[in-house]
Amino acid sequence: MKLITEEISNVKIITEGKGSNKKLYIEGVFLQGNLKNRNGRMYPMETLSREVSRYNEAFVQKGRALGELGHPDGPTVNLDRVSHKITSLTQEGSNFRGKAQILNTPMGKIASSLLDEGVMLGVSSRGVGSLKEDRGGIKVVGEDFMLATAADIVADPSAPDAFVSGIMEGKEWIW
């Protein structure tokens, strides 16, 4: 299986609450299906919907959907690099919109500081699965795809709603 990463940039910054109860969130399109992205991959909606449903049940609803600042070298979430917790992930057509709370962790503080200073950050999904090239040269993500995290925070955002190569592109992983 391959580590598969995708990057999207159009995220909105939201601050909720006042004073010491203030919480910072990012929100936007985290995943897209049935669309050939710029690195030639396509996630079938059936596969993506099934996996997002599993991810929501196993992680989001239980407060375990964590993401990191930057991309790590593997599919597992490293607690020492966690910057945010994904609080919602819902389907809107072929897009999956997400919302994530920036946490009061060392990496969360860095992300918060960057956002406060006006740095445009993107989000990038991370998962493992197989790729099969179709007749048109599109790499179709296989039914064995498993989402590791719906969103890591990354420094190199692409154009709005566009996928670009993740930094872990092409690395081989055994699940």
Question: Each PLM stretch: what is its role?
Answer:
Residues 3, 12-28, 65-68, 78, ...:
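Residue microenvironments linked to proteolytic maturation
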Residues 35, 73-75, 104-106:
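Short, charged/polar surface micro-motifs in flexible loops or helix N-caps
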Residues 57-76:
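Amphipathic interaction/junction segments at domain boundaries or subunit interfaces
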